[in-house]
Amino acid sequence: MFSLPLHQSKLIFLLSFLLIKTLNAQPTYLLSYCYTSGNYTPNSSYKSNLDTLISVLDSQSSNKGFYSYASGSSPTTTVYGSYLCRGDISSSTCETCISRASKNVFIWCPVQKEAIIWYEECFLRYSSRKIFSILDQGPFVTWTSYDTTLYQFYFINTVEYRMDRLIQEAYSSSSYFAEETYHVSYLGEVYDLNGLVQCTPDLNQYDCYRCLKSAYNETKDCCYGKRFALVYSSNCMLTYKATFLAPPPPPPPPPPPPPPPQRLYGENDTPSSDESFSFKLGKVFRRIIAPVIAAVVIILVISVCSLCCCCIKKKKKANQREASIEIPTLNTGENLTVDHQ
């Protein structure tokens, strides 16, 4: 059997580990949006300023979670851009995400003057108009899951309450960021509800609140009742996810069919009116009518027997009288009696 030397096996294992770690560290691409406000030509000043902007943003991603920059001196060729990384990721993950976004945005939007690219870990945008400290009511990117929780009404109410608290916490803080893990246990369904909200730091408090509320309202259209929801705009991020800690319980069995109607009743049972009448009639028959009928039958039998006896006796006496007949003689004065007995 072929086997590798020990040092080669260790090297292969190390390379495999690094490859898996690298693949797992790759940012998750969501969507790109190319605005229709205008295009630039490849060799224009706008293109040159755009390249400078992207280079600066990429270089700052190693130590900053948010950065904005403007490249150019002429109002017609100046490019404004910024990026935002999620507050719960490491600086290396942020750097990887912005580096990937700065390259791929030109693949999806090769000539547009304004574009935005979203990853789950970050987003990057640029424009020919001023975008700093301005709430953009532009497009949203939404992601959701197909699966739901067993008790949706309770889940929806819990999500709404917890996300509202997170939004208040985020726009009230200096970082415009808030996250939490809320443990839920309801009728055997146990899960952790992880929530995260974040705004770009250049917004004021009111605009941060408006952005996050608009993002949450988007979840009611795309993700209502779903275990996972993600809504990003060009100024804020909002996401939540329910992670089950135990398999959800099976749905309760359907109720058993109703028992068939009972025909026998105890002392305290109350039958229906028709059945009660029949039941009472049977009791009356057994207690009163049946003995009366039996007595009548006995009397009739005795009467018939007595009548038969009387008839037999009368018939017998009649036969005896007919048998005793007087026969007169012709010549003598004596009577002859004939007895047939």
Swiss-Prot record:
Keywords: Disulfide bond, Repeat, Secreted, Signal. Residues 247-262 have a biased composition (Pro residues). Residues 247-274 are annotated as: Disordered. This is Cysteine-rich repeat secretory protein 1. Its main location: secreted. Belongs to the cysteine-rich repeat secretory protein family. It holds the Pfam family Stress-antifung. Residues 1-25 form the signal peptide. The keyword Lipoprotein does not apply. It comes from Arabidopsis thaliana. Residues 28-131, 136-245 form the Gnk2-homologous domain. The keyword DNA-binding does not apply. Disulfide bonds join 85-94, 97-122, 199-208, 211-236. The lineage of its organism: Eukaryota, Viridiplantae, Streptophyta, Embryophyta, Tracheophyta.
